């Protein structure tokens, strides 16, 4: 493991982000400073891996479910790109269809 990768791991080990596991990211204003710092640290680590042609696919298979209220192409493309980066297939849900089954 190279020095820079170890720095990311060391930085994450100093942060408390344990409450994020199996949670959502809807209410970002409720996240702690440590949780936000952990998100940015992981993003930096993923960027470094990608820049060095190291696979960032942490999933062999799986779905990234999207349920967006707006029709923003930029938002949908960003989500699809992130899912692809991690090895997930995107499944778009229509909000109107989702309500019919609730």
Positions of predicted regions on the chain:
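Anionic-ligand anchoring segments at beta-strand to alpha-helix junctions in alpha/beta enzyme folds, i.e.
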Residues: 75, 80, 85-98
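Conserved small/polar residues in nucleotide/adenosyl-binding loops
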Residues: 100-102
């Amino acid at each position: 493991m190279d020095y820079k990768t170890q720095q990311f791991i060391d930085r994450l080990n100093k942060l408390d982000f344990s409450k994020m596991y199996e949670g959502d990211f809807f209410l970002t204003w409720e996240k702690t400073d440590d949780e936000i710092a952990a998100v940015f640290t992981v993003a930096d680590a993923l960027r470094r891996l990608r820049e060095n042609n190291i696979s960032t696919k942490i999933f062999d298979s799986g779905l990234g479910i999207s349920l967006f209220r707006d029709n923003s192409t930029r938002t949908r493309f960003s989500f699809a790109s992130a899912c692809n980066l991690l090895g997930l297939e995107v499944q778009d849900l229509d909000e109107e269809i989702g309500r019919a089954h609730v």
